[in-house]
Each structure stands twice: as C-alpha cells, then as structure tokens.
Amino acid sequence: MTVSPPRAAPAVPSVSDTAYAAWAPDLQLLLGGEAAGPLRALIETASGELLSFCPRQVNHQPAQPGGGSSTIVQYGAQVRWAGGRVASETLVMATGGRIPRRAAVVDGDGVRVGIWRWPFDPDLPGLASAVDADTVSALLATLGMGGGKVRLTVRAYRPGRRAVIEASGTHGRVFLKVVRPHRVQALHAQHRLLARHMAVPHSYGYSTDGILVLQALHGGSLRGALSGPAVPLPGASALQGLLDQLPAELAQNQMSGDHLSRANHYADVVAGCLPDERVRLDELLGRYAFSEAGEHPTVAVHGDFYEGQILVERGRVSGLLDVDTAGSGHRIERVGDDARPPIRPRPAAPEGNRDLRTSAGLLLRLNSYRVVAGVLVAASRR
C-alpha cells in the first residue's frame, strides 16, 4: 500500500525545506509524511484503508509562556472501505490545547495527537445529526417549519469550533450553524436581538446538542463581489452605516477580542509557519509601536468585520453574518481586516467602486497601526 506523501517532507508544496526544518515539532508532524501513521491507524480502526491524504486547512498557535504550541489540521483523504468502495473523507488531527477532551489520542513520533473523522467531531456533538437528512427534517418539524425531504450542503467547517450546513426543502432554505452545545442558547439570543435591529439572520430555534437554525438572507458575499466580474457595490458610507445599526445593548456585553493588542501574537503565528518573514514582520511591528491609537469610546462592535461577513445585492448591503463575537469594543480596532489584500481594484471596475476596493480604510480613515494589525490578522488566517 502506498500512502502519500511518502516521506518526512513538507506536505505543503509552497513551503521551503528550510522553513519546514524551523517549524515546531507538532507542525512538522501534522504537515509532514509522518502524519500518515496516525491517519492510517484511525481509518484502520473503522475497517478502511488510507490511500492518500493532503492537508486542506491549518490553524497553528505558537508556544506561549508555560505551554507548548498547538495545531489543528484538516485533511482531505481518499479511503477504500470494506467492499472496495473508494470515498473522499475529511480527517482531523490536533495537538496541544486543541485536543478535545473526548477525542481519540495517539502518540505520533513523541507528539500527543487527538484525531477524528468527519462528522464525528468531539467538540461538536450535533454535527453528525446536522448532516443527516432525516434528523434535520425532524428538527425542522419540531420548530414548526414543516418536515419533508431536505437536501444538505456543507458550507463551512472549522474543526472543534463550528460548521455551517445549508438545508433546502419544502420549508425553503435555512442554514444550520453547529457550535459547541454550551454556546448555542446565547448565540440564539444574540441572533434574535440583532435581527430586530438590522439584516442579521433570524434564529428559528436550536437543539441542545448545538444546532442553531438560521434564516437564509438574500445576496452574496462582498468578498465574492470584489473578486468576481464587476458589479455595483455599496459605498464605504453604507458599511459605516451597517456598523451604526448594531444595537447599543451590545456595548454592555463582554469586550470583544482586541486584534491590536495581539499584534505580536499574530506576528509569532506567521513567523512560526514562515520563519523567513520574521525580519519583515518585526519591521511592521516596529512601525505599529510608534503609532498612536488615541482615545476612542467603547461601543457596539461586530468583532470580526470583514468582506466575507457582509452580504450585498444590487449594489446594496443585504446582510451581516457571523455575529458570534459581537459585543463591546473600540470600533477603530475592528476594521483592520478591511485593509487586507483581497480589497484591490479590478481593471474593469466602475470608477465609483474603486475607492472601496483600493482603500477600504476610508471607512474609518485607517492609519498605519490599523493596517499593520489587518495585515497580521489576515496572514494568521491563511
């Protein structure tokens, strides 16, 4: 049997051997040829044969004082099951603090590794139900939306964190957001609150194992509009207005995460994967250190406001997604993502849209320290 990649080498073609050698041991294991061992063991326990695998998504956190690094990697794999059927499967391995309490754990070359197969995510017990058509139909009927046949499409999956499943049927179209069970009730309340004030998906209800049933809004993502054929787009003032619609009650909630104060951490994340960029990252941090943030009021903020979270239709903003992190904060700190590389002009773009693409910073007059934070946040997500 041949399992790819066949040797201890980077499984990511764009990474040099020099960079790979500087990686933390867990990152080397999960993105190198040795990853085949734990993955093969997982599949064999389910009476399958691992034919090939390839890393598809990586989240790495560098070592912190008093602890080691942690990494979680999602793989696409080809598996031959009993009877000779070959299927595409999603497999996940995690190290350090990213290992779920209920995950199977193996020792991979001296590194403790948690491992599981989609949809049996130990931190998302509702996921298996959310991808079962009969179970989803029964849940929708319980919520008064009618039963009947449903068609399910996976839209997103962040291992251990969340998954989004589109469900279509006689009831129309809804989205199932799968989260950790202890978070689902508060997230349901958050959606109900925000939907009363702005175009945020209404929550129809939830299951106790972490499935939230959300309204489907019209429109496509601003990210897609920016990268596709030229279309009318909302101006920067419309994006500012979207933030202004956030209800004041959110300012009483827990402070949303502060990207600016974590700039050094984001730089360490990037350098941990791309050590050759350390000098350039330090230069960016040096510029950031000399910038003045000034004093700004605590207001309601989205918490993760960037073009992928904004829906647009016919040149207007039609919705705002992923309000999990909405809370109190300083809005000047929340728009660094809008300075990310995807926002740039296209040759055929209408003149009226160019400012939005080339300088989303006009939204709140971004200055250098926010651009630095945006670059670091963007790099850490890749």
In which residue ranges do the predicted regions lie?
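Active-site activation/catalytic loop segments of kinase-like enzymes and analogous catalytic loops
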Residues: R334-S359, S368-R382
